[in-house]
């Protein structure tokens, strides 16, 4: 007999399998090719109450205060009672299990203490009170540690839906930017059919692209030949992944739309506008002075990816007539340039401005956006009906299956084909593939 959690995982896998087989049947019948994937994300509200939040910063701050209270309390206890001197060392991390051992030792010592006069009895009562207080601190520390364990890499979660993260939703009736528990739903579409989906706890789209491609590969044992997404996915890590895995990236980057405006003129003082001598590795400032390389700065992203930015320093900036427009810091100007990211941006710009890129950019607006519009406004699917990632995944898998079947029937009806005959063959094929899986 399966436990409830194991049963949820099993059901999620089976429903996901049905969705995958339906998409494969659609590909077999010519509705889609699985060669191109239009990717976008939206936030769907959880069933959890919006006032059940747990914030990482609050937990960490209160936990630090609690540890200070515990150390002060331990210092107040008689040294003859404390057997473990290590707890006085601030470098030792106190844990609930360590506090439980200390409490047990204190109780054992206090049980065998003999009191003869009134003052000794009063002191004994005070020490027992401190032990009870220490027990309360131990339980509170255990609660904070449990919160941090549930949080993982996230900054918040909901008490009634621990898998949900608090995010700012597009549907903000009060217009005050209030956060609500929800999930970042990423979908991939082709010809307005949902071909892949996955839920993420982080609100930003940048960190979801690579895991989402892995989801596609897990479903279909291959990656799409073309990936199309908006500027929210345009990072160095994502561009590099697509290049190394043979995915032709039609992915915008920040300021791409701004660059395409007719009245756009680049700022001549920005690092991107300065002349760069690749052979000798130096920049030329607007006054013609060389900016020589002085080092490299390395940064780690939230996903652990290391980016490298070359640093260049100007010469004789003091007294320069263009200094006020060029920069306002003291000393000589220093710029930082990520050459690898700039190269990826140039490649992306060439693709996006090509004839094929213009076609994909036009289709992206009517691919996932159309699905989200149908889902949220025509079908009123703005909030999940269940709690927990497994059940929520099943929830959307059912929706995606129904959505694809509805879209398929509409296409058949529009094409004037014999709907019943072809639909029967599709469902029979789907049934057989699910049995053989």
Stretch-by-stretch model annotation:
Residues 201, 206-207, 319, 358-436:
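Basic, amphipathic alpha-helical segments enriched in Lys/Arg and hydrophobic/aromatic residues
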Residues 47-50, 237, 284, 376, ...:
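Active-site-proximal flexible loops/turns
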Residues 25, 69, 73-76, 109, ...:
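Residues that form generic nucleotide/phosphate-binding pockets
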Residues 2, 188-189, 277:
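Hydrophobic alpha-helical segments, especially N-terminal targeting/anchoring helices
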């Amino acid at each position: 007999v399966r436990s409830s959690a194991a049963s949820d995982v099993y059901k999620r896998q089976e429903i996901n399998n049905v969705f995958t087989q339906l998409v494969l049947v659609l590909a077999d019948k010519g509705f889609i090719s699985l060669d191109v994937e239009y990717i976008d994300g939206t936030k769907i509200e959880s069933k959890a109450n919006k006032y059940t939040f747990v914030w990482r910063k609050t937990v960490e701050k209160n936990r630090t205060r609690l540890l200070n209270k515990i150390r002060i309390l331990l210092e107040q206890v008689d040294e003859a009672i404390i057997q473990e001197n290590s707890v006085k060392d601030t470098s030792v991390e106190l844990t609930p299990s360590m506090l439980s051992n200390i409490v047990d030792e204190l109780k054992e010592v206090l049980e065998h203490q003999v009191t003869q006069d009134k003052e000794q009895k009063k002191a004994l009562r005070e020490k027992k009170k401190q032990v009870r207080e220490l027990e309360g601190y131990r339980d509170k520390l255990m609660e904070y540690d449990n919160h941090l364990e549930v949080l993982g890499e996230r900054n918040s979660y909901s008490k009634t839906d621990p898998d949900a993260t608090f995010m700012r939703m597009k549907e903000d009736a009060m217009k005050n930017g209030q956060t609500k528990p929800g999930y970042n739903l990423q979908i991939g579409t082709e010809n307005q059919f949902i071909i892949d989906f996955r839920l993420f706890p982080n609100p930003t789209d940048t960190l979801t692209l690579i895991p989402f491609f892995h989801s596609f590969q897990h479903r279909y044992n291959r990656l799409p030949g073309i990936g199309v997404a908006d500027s929210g996915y345009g990072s160095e890590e994502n561009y590099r992944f697509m290049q190394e895995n043979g995915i032709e990236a039609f992915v915008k980057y920040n300021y791409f739309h701004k660059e395409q405006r007719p009245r756009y003129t680049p700022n001549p003082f920005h690092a991107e506008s300065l002349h760069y001598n690749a052979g000798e590795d130096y920049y030329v400032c607007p006054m013609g002075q060389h900016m020589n390389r002085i080092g490299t700065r390395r940064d780690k992203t939230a996903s652990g990816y290391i980016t490298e930015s070359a640093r260049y320093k100007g010469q004789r900036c003091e007294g320069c007539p263009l200094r006020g427009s060029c920069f306002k810091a003291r000393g000589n100007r220093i710029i930082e340039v990520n050459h690898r990211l700039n190269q990826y941006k140039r490649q992306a710009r060439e693709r996006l401005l090509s004839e094929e890129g213009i076609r994909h950019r036009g289709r992206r607006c009517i691919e996932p956006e159309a699905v989200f519009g149908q889902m949220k406004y025509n079908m009123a699917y703005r909030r999940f009906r269940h709690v927990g990632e497994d059940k929520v995944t099943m929830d959307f898998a059912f929706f995606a299956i129904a959505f694809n079947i509805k879209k398929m029937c509409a296409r058949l009806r529009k094409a004037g084909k014999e709907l019943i005959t072809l639909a029967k063959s599709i469902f029979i094929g789907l049934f057989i593939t699910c049995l053989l899986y």
